Amino acid sequence: MKPPILVFIVYLLQLRDCQCAPTGKDRTSIREDPKGFSKAGEIDVDEEVKKALIGMKQMKILMERREEEHSKLMRTLKKCREEKQEALKLMNEVQEHLEEEERLCQVSLMDSWDECKSCLESDCMRFYTTCQSSWSSMKSTIERVFRKIYQFLFPFHEDDEKELPVGEKFTEEDVQLMQIENVFSQLTVDVGFLYNMSFHVFKQMQQEFDLAFQSYFMSDTDSMEPYFFPAFSKEPAKKAHPMQSWDIPSFFQLFCNFSLSVYQSVSATVTEMLKATEDLSKQDKDSAHGGPSSTTWPVRGRGLCGEPGQNSSECLQFHARCQKCQDYLWADCPAVPELYTKADEALELVNISNQQYAQVLQMTQHHLEDTTYLMEKMREQFGWVTELASQTPGSENIFSFIKVVPGVHEGNFSKQDEKMIDISILPSSNFTLTIPLEESAESSDFISYMLAKAVQHFKEHFKSW
């Protein structure tokens, strides 16, 4: 026996093709013999079921494509995470090496502290680090080294601030990635289950479908384009993102393709610093003669760059003192300046890797949310057809008229322009439609009206995931 829904829908389509309004005799037969009315059309295929099956097929196709995209995103995300861990490991190794070298350096430079600390406090140092970018790096290195010596000499100034354990952060990331994988995996299972149910419905009704539709529905989803993709768009401006196409470009792999660059030598910085000092000395001479270099340029929060020019001899003495401190540093702690540079670059690498991991994570989450949204919309639109899979051959009609109640009298008011029709949808549920006569027996739109109401009822009562 054909699936019950086919009995009713085929009959509806046959009547709609006739394009003729029912007569008074037809109205009597509808009221007196509803079962005969429901059996009248067992010829054509149910277009609503066919449309829903097409939707379920496309749902499967779209989910498979989303699975591929999700896999690429997750591979990229995990690679980013690995690279972030490597960057952090590198930074820790450099920091440990630096701390060891600093311990060796502290004792040897203790005697130089009193002589070199004035270099760090000089107005000329503030001038050089403000107006000459090359000096900033060198000053930072010297200052960091001698501050550590100061902390060594005066332990109560030691900075006890420590970072949070890294292990806790990575554990949180593990949980986050696992949650994403679990949600997507469950969504994949749910979509697969719905498609299998719809395939069962297709097999029950296969003989009623044309060969072209059978060929499409049975085809490999990777080798044939679907009939259409329904345009399910989210509300305006919801989850707007520049990467919404979700075609995974190759540049994702470049996000985490990190490697250490060749560290700049400290000697190059020193050379630039000395050159800047010579240039400044020339500018001071020009300023003494009223040259153009006497013009001052304000620097936000640092005063005027022209201030030290008023006492060039003091700055030249400052240069000599700092040069001596630099010589001490190079002689007693040759590895420390370079390790400071490496530590700075390793920290920058960690920061970049954290940012890029966060970007890919955000894209992965958006992709999951968009996929969930699309699957839910397609399930709401087409998933009702899977309810028919529970009907076995030989069961009662899914769509059938049980009774027709003519006009109802309420006091002095007569509702003879309406009729009540009880319709059975599946053995477990009945519902009643109140249909105006002009929209039923006397109208050629009666079949379309009934069909729309029945499908709407199915969708409204179709259970969620």
From Swiss-Prot:
<feature type="disulfide bond">
    <location>
        <begin position="131"/>
        <end position="305"/>
    </location>
</feature>
<feature type="glycosylation site" description="N-linked (GlcNAc...) asparagine">
    <location>
        <position position="257"/>
    </location>
</feature>
<dbReference type="InterPro" id="IPR016014">
    <property type="entry name" value="Clusterin_N"/>
</dbReference>
<feature type="signal peptide">
    <location>
        <begin position="1"/>
        <end position="20"/>
    </location>
</feature>
<keyword id="KW-0964">Secreted</keyword>
<keyword id="KW-1015">Disulfide bond</keyword>
<feature type="disulfide bond">
    <location>
        <begin position="116"/>
        <end position="325"/>
    </location>
</feature>
<feature type="region of interest" description="Disordered">
    <location>
        <begin position="280"/>
        <end position="300"/>
    </location>
</feature>
<feature type="glycosylation site" description="N-linked (GlcNAc...) asparagine">
    <location>
        <position position="412"/>
    </location>
</feature>
<keyword id="KW-0732">Signal</keyword>
<dbReference type="InterPro" id="IPR016015">
    <property type="entry name" value="Clusterin_C"/>
</dbReference>
<protein>
    <recommendedName>
        <fullName>Clusterin-like protein 1</fullName>
    </recommendedName>
</protein>
<dbReference type="GO" id="GO:0005615">
    <property type="term" value="C:extracellular space"/>
</dbReference>
<feature type="disulfide bond">
    <location>
        <begin position="105"/>
        <end position="333"/>
    </location>
</feature>
<dbReference type="GO" id="GO:0051787">
    <property type="term" value="F:misfolded protein binding"/>
</dbReference>
<feature type="disulfide bond">
    <location>
        <begin position="124"/>
        <end position="315"/>
    </location>
</feature>
<keyword id="KW-0175">Coiled coil</keyword>
<dbReference type="Pfam" id="PF01093">
    <property type="entry name" value="Clusterin"/>
</dbReference>
<feature type="coiled-coil region">
    <location>
        <begin position="62"/>
        <end position="107"/>
    </location>
</feature>
<feature type="disulfide bond">
    <location>
        <begin position="119"/>
        <end position="322"/>
    </location>
</feature>
<comment type="similarity">
    <text>Belongs to the clusterin family.</text>
</comment>
<feature type="glycosylation site" description="N-linked (GlcNAc...) asparagine">
    <location>
        <position position="430"/>
    </location>
</feature>
<dbReference type="InterPro" id="IPR000753">
    <property type="entry name" value="Clusterin-like"/>
</dbReference>
<feature type="glycosylation site" description="N-linked (GlcNAc...) asparagine">
    <location>
        <position position="351"/>
    </location>
</feature>
<dbReference type="GO" id="GO:0005634">
    <property type="term" value="C:nucleus"/>
</dbReference>
<keyword id="KW-0325">Glycoprotein</keyword>
<feature type="glycosylation site" description="N-linked (GlcNAc...) asparagine">
    <location>
        <position position="311"/>
    </location>
</feature>
<feature type="glycosylation site" description="N-linked (GlcNAc...) asparagine">
    <location>
        <position position="196"/>
    </location>
</feature>
